[in-house]
Amino acid sequence: MASTDDPAGQRPSRAEAIVAHAEQSISEDAIVAAARERAVDMGAGAVTPAVGALLSVLARLTEAKAVVEVGTGAGVSGLWLLSGMREDGVLTTIDVEPEHQRIAKQAFTEAGIGPGRTRLISGRAQDVLTRLADESYDLVFIDADPVDQPQFVVEGVRLLRSGGAIVVHRAALGGRAGDAGANDAEVSAVREAARLIAEDERLTPVLIPLGDGLLAAARD
């Protein structure tokens, strides 16, 4: 009899089963679910429920008052981050697409988040990040084109206060980042970002197998 776990009858690996269980264990409210649907409609990526929940936990653990997000999308990750931040916390979220930010703003409004708690900046993150103050942020979340990860990591670490954390999404690239035979531009950039974090003595990193891989690091 064919397995019901896979159309081809192949059972998922233990690792795949654990990740699937982690994702299925998270319930999203109607506002986040609606934002996720809009992300699909507009072709914008969105973090998985388990990744979102982890972002909320990290924001809570760092008692985040100031957070930077690179890649606003439809506001899914922003909603999760805000749910874990302090009530007086401010999320600065950057996206090159004004339409993404318009849709995200709708999600924030639906969630009852006051305008003073979000700062939406439309522009290239490469330009915006350099204008933000050193060591002024509790959490930096990078969810952008993998080829830009090294530059964003350098800027993100600069922004972190002592005790803060940086999180880089798409750190696994579907497993390609760990494939010795893969060496395309995305893989090379992701590996360089990981090297920058690993060699920074101020950082304690961990690679988390959720979503497309999360590389997280806490700053001493």
Swiss-Prot record:
One of its GO terms (biological process) is methylation. Belongs to the class I-like SAM-binding methyltransferase superfamily. Cation-dependent O-methyltransferase family. Substrate binds at D143. One of its GO terms (molecular function) is O-methyltransferase activity. It is an enzyme of class 2 (transferase). PROSITE patterns: SAM_OMT_I (PS51682). Coiled coil: none annotated. This is Putative O-methyltransferase Mkms_4069. Keywords: Methyltransferase, S-adenosyl-L-methionine, Transferase. Gene3D superfamilies: Vaccinia Virus protein VP39 (3.40.50.150). Disulfide bonds: none annotated. InterPro entries: Cation-dep_OMT, SAM-dependent_MTases_sf, SAM_O-MeTrfase. S-adenosyl-L-methionine binds at V47, E69, G71, T72, S77, D95, V96, D145. Pfam families: Methyltransf_3 (PF01596). Its EC number is 2.1.1.-.
